[in-house]
């Protein structure tokens, strides 16, 4: 979905890890395995930082505490150096509080914060308070993965028109990290292939293949203690993990996906049908056969988690069993890559793959402009500057996060001062971003209503004693009924 809740890693620790990876040339590296090709190369639009008339004015930008703020501050400094009449102040607050500060200010129609930061999930909650950026910011849509832009950047109004309400600045996905050395072990792989008929290593054709690897490495051979770590935390994480699994089943069931097997309808996404109902609103898609199968698969995968399932694993700990050699893989956000690499020697064995079937889930962040700001033109110019390839590339070299720009990715890929292994990571993350369509809804009521209405009954099922089809169906029916009532 998105980096909806940041991992419990301190900023200082993250920066230290980034220094190890970027400057010292990390001992760890990611190897990307996916059947999906990169987007077609296009010419990117260059961005200038000055006009015929000198830029003047002050900007206040509010964001959450994150390593990417080092890049943001550096970009602000260079922008101000090129435009002496401009002053930019960056206000960083904790992830749990910054949205409250933003919303309180916006609801009061205050011009205090010219630029706000939001995530894929929270973006539409701000839709009524931010400016339509169409005509204000020029996007080269061929230069950024469409799923990253669609999931939080666009808002479809009731009259059918679409507004650009935010601009993504990083690429982030929810996908599979795994122990490459273990899964490619010749002896184990030979034994596995004789029994199951395919390789343990990715790409995997479906989720049953993942479950087979779990069973082989944990139950049959006792090679590791845990399987693919699958986060079923009730507070938020279920709404990320379930659609990541459900995406496969959704795309293979035209009765729910219709003509939109890779993403569904804008803002509704895959947890609603890929087509509108008679009222013009799509119905929930997950309470049918495809959704039930996905939920039962999630239950089965969580049996290979640290127990009791649903209480031990969360955003801040999902990578720990993999990092410590106790699990063969983890379903997690790419933003956690620095944490996953923090502990050698196993860090050198960690690789990343797309989800079974060759897709991923999106989890990026956005900058939006306060519609009550008195400096909207200047704010748009600064955002344009941040996504220009040369500036956007520095989000990796300064902060260890991954650029949204394809041209920025190419700049980094050709930079011989960056270790080849690290360059593989950069390209890998961009590639998963291009297929990050397996997303939950990002409607205005997603955070306040839809997430708890879904997570609560699903958590009860996941932590229950039965994986029966009827129990799964009942949980999904309960969630679907609540969604129908909420959405209309």
Residue ranges of model-derived segments:
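Conserved C-terminal helix/tail region of periplasmic/extracytoplasmic solute-binding proteins
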Residues: 430-488
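A ligand-binding cleft/hinge motif common to bilobed small-molecule-binding domains
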Residues: 120-127, 333-346
């Amino acid at each position: 979905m998105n980096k909806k809740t940041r991992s419990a890693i301190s900023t200082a620790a993250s920066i230290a890890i980034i220094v190890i990876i970027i400057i010292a040339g990390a001992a760890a590296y990611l190897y990307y395995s996916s059947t999906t090709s990169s987007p077609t190369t296009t010419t990117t639009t260059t961005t200038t930082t000055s006009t015929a008339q000198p830029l003047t004015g002050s900007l206040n930008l509010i964001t959450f505490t994150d390593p990417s703020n080092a890049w943001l501050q550096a970009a602000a400094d260079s922008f101000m150096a090129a435009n002496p009449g401009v002053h930019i102040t960056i206000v960083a607050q904790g992830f749990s509080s910054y949205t409250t500060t933003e919303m309180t200010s916006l609801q009061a129609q205050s011009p205090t914060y010219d630029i706000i930061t939001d995530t894929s999930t929270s973006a539409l909650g701000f839709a009524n308070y931010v400016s339509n950026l169409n005509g204000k910011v020029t996007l080269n849509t061929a230069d950024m993965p469409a799923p990253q832009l669609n999931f939080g950047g666009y808002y479809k109004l009731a009259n059918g028109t679409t507004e650009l309400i935010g601009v993504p600045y990083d690429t982030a996905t929810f996908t599979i990290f795994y122990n490459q050395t273990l899964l490619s072990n010749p002896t184990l792989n030979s034994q596995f292939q004789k029994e199951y008929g395919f390789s343990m290593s990715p790409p995997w054709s479906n989720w049953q293949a993942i479950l087979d690897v779990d069973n082989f490495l944990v139950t049959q051979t006792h090679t590791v203690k845990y399987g693919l770590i699958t986060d079923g935390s009730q507070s938020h994480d279920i709404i990320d993990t379930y659609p990541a699994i459900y995406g496969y089943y959704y795309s293979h069931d035209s009765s729910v996906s219709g003509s939109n097997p890779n993403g569904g309808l804008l803002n509704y996404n895959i947890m609603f049908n890929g087509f509108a109902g008679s009222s013009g609103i799509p119905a929930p898609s997950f309470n049918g056969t495809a959704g039930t199968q996905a939920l039962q698969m999630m239950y089965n995968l969580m049996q290979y988690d640290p127990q009791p399932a649903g209480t031990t694993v969360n955003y801040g700990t999902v990578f720990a069993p993999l990092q410590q050699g106790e699990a063969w893989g983890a379903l997690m956000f790419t933003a956690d890559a620095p944490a996953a690499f923090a502990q050698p020697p196993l860090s050198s064995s960690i690789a990343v793959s797309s989800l079974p079937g060759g897709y991923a889930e999106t989890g990026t962040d956005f900058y939006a402009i306060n519609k009550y700001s008195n400096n909207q033109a200047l704010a748009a110019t600064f955002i344009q500057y941040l996504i220009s390839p040369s500036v956007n590339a520095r989000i990796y070299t300064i902060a260890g996060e991954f650029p949204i720009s394809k041209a920025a990715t190419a700049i980094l890929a050709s930079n011989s001062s960056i270790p080849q292994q690290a360059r593989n990571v950069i390209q890998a993350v961009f590639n998963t971003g291009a297929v990050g369509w397996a997303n939950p809804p990002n409607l205005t009521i997603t955070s306040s209503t839809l997430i708890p209405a879904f997570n609560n009954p699903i958590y009860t099922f996941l932590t229950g004693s039965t994986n029966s089809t009827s129990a799964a169906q009942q949980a999904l029916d309960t969630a679907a009924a609540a969604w129908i009532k909420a959405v209309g």
